């Protein structure tokens, strides 16, 4: 096989109903300098046979069968096998949009990362698109402008590794964290951003993210989900701290801490605690939550480090809902001044 431009890594687990659509979306691309690495992660349906069928008829398809280890292990196995100059991740229940690969490689120089957009499909019906505002290369001293111009505008673009190209040499030894089962793909993206020095953005939706109506379910309010968030957050915060240290003149990175760590994850936990009883709710857990809020420079009351004590007292007095409402009010007031 000639040297390929892109290695497309597809983890597969019990995807017999969507895998053909996924693979045909790649075969329908005009751009053809790619290999497709199918990592069958212990499927118990017909997915294994589908993978073998494609790899037996097209040399660009490579199939690896392994015992079920999870999506991160499957992606890592694909990374270890990749030969392309760039690697790309595609989930087996999603699809590439028409001309996706052409749009991704058009205008590419030697950037470490290419960031495209995605379209959401709910029960097959096209919905919103999330994509960069313009085609722009951020290199050298301009790399920090990527964060200034993009990190808040559409921060959802950085939640997942798909709709992106990663230079394989830049990836190096970076791998998905196999100890986590929540947001490990987000950590991969931010670790790449921490170690990279150039990004190309393209203003096109290149990836189709397929969802079913109501597929989010009720798991996001379970104690198990809260535990997963607690395992993920310290690693995410460490990466944000690295970016803050590397780019001290980009305040929007700290704003992301305010909006994402505090406004998204911590307030979700507190609101769950305010609505129902939980075995996780204790003084130690709240001390951890409020210590992270204390680190939020956007709220003066927490920069004075008085966030923990009164809220722990409110917890003991069974006044946690009041505490959460007070924090939410202060947070909105703070954001309105920025």
Regions found by a protein language model. Name each.
Residues 33-42, 62-67, 91-92:
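Short beta-strand/loop segment that forms part of the nucleotide-sugar
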Residues 71, 92-200, 207-227, 248:
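Donor-binding/catalytic cores of nucleotide-activated saccharide
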């Amino acid at each position: 096989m000639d040297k390929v431009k892109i290695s497309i890594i597809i983890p597969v687990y019990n995807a017999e109903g969507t895998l053909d659509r996924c693979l045909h979306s790649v075969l329908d691309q005009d751009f053809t300098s790619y290999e497709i690495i199918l990592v069958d992660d212990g499927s118990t349906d017909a997915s294994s046979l589908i993978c073998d069928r494609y790899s037996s008829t097209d040399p660009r398809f490579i199939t690896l069968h392994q015992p079920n280890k999870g999506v991160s292990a499957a992606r890592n196995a694909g990374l270890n096998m990749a030969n392309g100059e760039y690697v790309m991740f595609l989930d087996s229940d999603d699809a590439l949009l028409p001309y996706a690969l052409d749009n991704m490689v058009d205008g590419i120089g030697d950037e470490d990362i290419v960031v495209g957009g995605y379209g959401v499909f709910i029960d097959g019906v096209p919905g919103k698109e999330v994509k960069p505002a313009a085609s722009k290369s951020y290199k050298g001293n301009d790399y920090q402008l990527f964060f200034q111009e993009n990190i808040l505008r559409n921060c959802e673009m950085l939640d997942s590794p798909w709709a992106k190209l990663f230079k394989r040499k830049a990836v190096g030894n970076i791998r998905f964290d196999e100890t986590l089962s929540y947001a490990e793909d987000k950590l991969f993206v931010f670790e790449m951003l921490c170690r990279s020095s150039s990004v190309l953005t393209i203003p096109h939706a290149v990836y189709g993210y397929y969802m079913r109506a109501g597929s989010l379910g009720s798991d996001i309010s379970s104690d198990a989900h809260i535990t997963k968030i607690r395992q993920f957050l310290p690693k995410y915060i460490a990466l944000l701290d690295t970016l803050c240290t590397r780019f001290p003149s980009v305040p929007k990175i700290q704003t992301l801490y305010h909006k994402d760590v505090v406004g998204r994850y911590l307030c979700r936990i507190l609101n769950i605690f305010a609505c129902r009883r939980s075995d996780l709710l204790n003084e130690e857990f709240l001390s951890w939550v409020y210590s992270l809020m204390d680190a939020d420079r956007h709220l003066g009351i927490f920069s004075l480090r008085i966030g923990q004590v009164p809220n722990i007292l409110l917890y003991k007095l069974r006044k946690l809902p009041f505490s959460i409402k007070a924090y939410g009010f202060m947070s909105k007031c703070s954001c309105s001044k920025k």
